[in-house]
């Protein structure tokens, strides 16, 4: 059976496959006209099946339509019309190129508005009246000063006017008139300068006005471009709305009523459901795009309002600027008129006063003519007095005696004043030296002090044993040497005479020694010819110890004072350089050769593997260590010195401290160096091994001179490795420590050449700048790579193992001796030198 049929125009209505192709059509390119979508077929409900694989149609396309059939066809065509409308506005959706283009245009307009607001803010800050107000205030102050000057001139003229006419010796009024004219010319010059400043201010105002006009022109161009862009976007928007309206106004293309359509394929049903879903998605996109267009219109309207406000503000700023400029010009013009009027009045008054002065001058001349008879009378009186003067010799002698007494008293007063001035000069000299020492400390210069030994019996007698060294009575940093009949002066940090004691010398270096406790590296070395007293200054005797023992005693006293807050450990090592061989003075085998190496931890410091290290707890321990070291040091007899040191001795004192409250660790090192004396082989009579020793000593001291010369000239390469001595002193001379040199000199005539060389070397060393010393301190606990083993105190301090590496920790000083043992499994840090 065939069901009742409804009419369907197969020539005008596309099939379902055609509708599917329309739904999947690609989007048109931006700027091109979008073709109108094809009308959709009715897809509101599935059609009844009539047979497999085909659609049944009823009447032909000319068959008339009944009433109920017409209403059914309309209801069935509504989904197709909705899909057609959705396709007509789909080109303006959020994902379409044209919608993206509109969004970009709106963002571009927003950026333009922001840049214009920034430009207006910049103009507002540039066109502020701060500079103009400052210039105006300066001009007002200048005009006020000129007014005060005019008032002062008027007061002087008034004083001249009120002064009674009388004799005018020396033309005083003429001089005052000349001064008034000079003041008048000065006021005119100041007025010209004020006019120049005014013209410069006007020029600056004109430049700012031109700049403002230029900025306004640029702003107007930007606003015009923005208006054109807005007009173009509005036009495009109107075209889009018109296109949408025209597409909506089109009548649906369905002209015939569907009669009967039956779907006989499951694939066709699926295509129909997909088409309906796409219809719904397109409708949502249209609603979303309409909302976006509405927001864009609101943003565009707000940008228009902001532009109008900015234009109004610019106009207001222009009016304020013009008003301020006008007020300033009026004020300046009025001030200039007042100034000109005051100058003219002062000039007129000065002319009147000049006339009065000339009249007074004429009266004075008349008075002079009348005084000539009186002058003749006075001449006669003078002749009479002259005759009387012949009887005044006795009176003159009496007067001379009184004058001599007064002169003697004046001389005594001058002498007392000179004594007071000399006392003040010496006080200022001491203050200058103190300031100079502080400057040297800040710069890091090597401080140099000189000590002159007394004349001894080894110097002999005769002309060669006379004293060739003198001192400045007012300045203790100046030393004078008489060399070959010519005096030579040297300036050092401090000069000690032969009468100076060991304590006096130690007081000069005491501050450096105490800085070792605070974590600084300190080096004190003695330099000079053989027999000049270096070993005596550094080591001294048992009754009168030198710097070495006094320094350690001072360290122990300082450690005891800080025992409540700090824990300190003091270790001592001693070495000598004999014939360019480094030997351990405290070891069991003093003849063993040691080497100087770099620390493997990358710190750049030097250390001596195998150097014996003693931990000392008291002064008795120090004395025992010194005695043990003295027995191993090399000394021999020469013609110049009975106990000549044939090696460079080095005493290394390491102070490690821990702050009990903060855990701060400090490590300070004190190097006390007793250099072997330079000598001339002809004088010392060295032969054999003594000659070889002298050659090595002179070679190492020459290398030290090369290092000082390189440091003084700030060369890039400093030859520290030319000798064991300079290599060992590298840390002390490379700017990481506080260094002091004690130069020992002989005062007798036969040693003036060596004394001259030593003092010249001292001056060169004094000019070397190493930089301020660095404090070695860090927070944290001591390294746990070593452990301490306590042993009871014994008669002789025991060495703390052969120092294959530097100790990394320490403990507080306690009774008894401490021996440091390295753990077999641990690797300790190398000992820095």
From Swiss-Prot:
One of its GO terms (molecular function) is microtubule binding. GO terms for cellular component: centrosome; cytoplasmic vesicle membrane; extracellular exosome; Golgi apparatus; kinesin complex; microtubule; microtubule cytoskeleton; mitochondrion. It comes from Homo sapiens (Human). This is Kinesin-like protein KIFC3. It comes from the Eukaryota. The keyword ATP-binding applies. The gene is KIFC3. SMART domains: KISc. Residues 30-48 have a biased composition (Low complexity). The lineage of its organism: Eukaryota, Metazoa, Chordata, Craniata, Vertebrata. ATP binds at residues 528-535. It holds the Pfam family Kinesin.
């Amino acid at each position: 059976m065939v069901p009742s049929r409804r009419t369907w125009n197969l020539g005008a209505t596309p099939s379902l496959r055609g509708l599917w192709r329309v739904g999947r059509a690609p989007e048109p390119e931006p700027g091109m006209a979008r073709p109108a979508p094809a009308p959709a077929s009715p897809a509101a409900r599935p059609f009844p099946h009539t047979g497999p694989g085909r659609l049944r149609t009823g009447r032909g396309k000319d068959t008339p339509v009944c009433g109920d059939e017409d209403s059914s066809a309309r209801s069935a065509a509504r989904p197709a019309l909705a899909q057609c409308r959705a396709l007509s506005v789909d080109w303006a959706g959020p994902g379409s190129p044209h919608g993206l283009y509109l969004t970009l245009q709106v963002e571009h307009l927003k950026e333009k508005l922001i840049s214009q607001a920034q430009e207006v803010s910049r103009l507002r800050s540039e066109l502020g009246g701060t500079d103009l107000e400052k210039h105006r205030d300066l001009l007002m102050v200048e005009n006020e000063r000129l007014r005060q000057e005019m008032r002062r001139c008027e007061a002087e003229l008034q004083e001249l006017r009120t002064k009674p006419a009388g004799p005018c010796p020396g033309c005083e009024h003429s001089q005052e008139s000349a001064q008034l004219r000079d003041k008048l010319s000065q006021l005119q010059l100041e007025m010209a300068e004020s006019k120049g400043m005014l013209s410069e201010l006007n020029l600056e105002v004109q430049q700012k006005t031109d700049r403002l006009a230029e900025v306004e022109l640029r702003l107007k161009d930007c606003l015009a471009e923005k208006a054109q862009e807005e007009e173009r976007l509005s036009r495009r928007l109107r075209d889009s709305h018109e296109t949408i309206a025209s597409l909506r106004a089109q009548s649906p293309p369905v002209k015939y009523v569907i009669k009967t359509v039956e779907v006989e394929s499951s694939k066709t049903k699926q295509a129909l459901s997909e088409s309906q879903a796409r219809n719904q998605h397109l409708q949502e996109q249209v609603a979303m795009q309409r909302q976006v267009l509405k927001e864009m219109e609101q943003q565009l309207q707000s940008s228009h309002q902001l532009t109008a406000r900015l234009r109004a503000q610019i106009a207001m700023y222009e009016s304020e600027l013009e008003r301020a400029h006008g007020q300033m010009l009026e004020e300046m013009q009025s001030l200039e008129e007042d100034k000109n009027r005051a100058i003219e009045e002062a000039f007129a008054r000065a002319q009147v006063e000049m006339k009065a002065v000339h009249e007074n001058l004429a009266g004075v001349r008349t008075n002079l003519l009348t005084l000539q008879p009186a002058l003749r009378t006075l001449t006669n009186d003078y002749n009479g007095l002259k005759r009387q003067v012949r009887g005044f010799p006795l009176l003159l002698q009496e007067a001379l005696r009184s004058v001599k007494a007064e002169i003697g008293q004046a001389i005594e007063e001058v002498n007392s004043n000179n004594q007071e001035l000399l006392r003040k000069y010496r006080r200022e000299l001491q203050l200058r030296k103190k300031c100079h020492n502080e400057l040297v400390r800040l710069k890091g210069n090597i401080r140099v002090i000189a000590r002159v030994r007394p004349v001894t019996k080894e110097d002999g007698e005769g002309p060669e044993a006379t004293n060739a060294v003198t001192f400045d009575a007012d300045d203790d940093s100046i030393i004078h040497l008489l060399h070959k009949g010519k005096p030579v002066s040297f300036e050092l940090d401090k000069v000690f005479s032969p009468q100076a004691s060991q304590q006096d010398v130690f007081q000069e270096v005491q501050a450096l020694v105490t800085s070792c406790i605070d974590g600084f590296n300190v080096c004190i070395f003695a330099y000079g010819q053989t027999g000049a007293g270096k070993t005596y200054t550094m080591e001294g005797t048992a009754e009168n110890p030198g710097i070495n023992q006094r320094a350690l005693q001072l360290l122990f006293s300082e450690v005891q004072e800080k025992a409540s807050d700090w824990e300190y450990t003091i270790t001592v090592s001693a070495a000598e350089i004999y014939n360019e061989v480094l030997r351990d003075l405290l070891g069991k085998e003093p003849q063993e050769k040691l080497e100087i190496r770099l620390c493997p931890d990358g710190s750049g410091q030097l250390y001596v593997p195998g150097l014996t290290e003693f931990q000392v707890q008291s002064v008795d321990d120090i004395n025992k260590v010194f005695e043990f070291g003295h027995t191993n040091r090399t000394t021999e007899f020469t013609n110049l010195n009975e106990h000549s040191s044939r090696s460079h001795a080095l005493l290394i004192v390491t102070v490690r401290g821990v702050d009990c409250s903060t855990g701060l660790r400090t490590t300070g090192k004190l190097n006390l160096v007793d250099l072997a004396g330079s000598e001339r082989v002809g004088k010392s009579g060295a032969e054999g091994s003594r000659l070889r020793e002298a050659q090595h000593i002179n070679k190492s001291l020459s290398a030290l001179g090369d290092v000082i010369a390189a440091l003084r000239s700030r060369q890039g390469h400093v030859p520290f490795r030319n000798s064991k001595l300079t290599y060992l002193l590298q840390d002390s001379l490379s700017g990481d420590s506080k260094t002091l040199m004690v130069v020992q000199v002989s005062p007798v005539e036969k040693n003036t050449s060596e004394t001259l060389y030593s003092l010249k070397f001292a001056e060169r060393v004094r000019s070397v700048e190493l930089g301020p010393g660095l404090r070695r301190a860090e927070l944290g606990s001591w390294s746990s790579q070593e452990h301490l083993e306590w042993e009871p105190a014994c008669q002789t301090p025991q060495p703390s193992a052969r120092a294959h590496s530097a100790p990394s920790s320490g403990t507080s000083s306690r009774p008894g001796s401490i021996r440091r043992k390295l753990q077999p499994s641990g690797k300790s840090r190398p000992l820095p030198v």
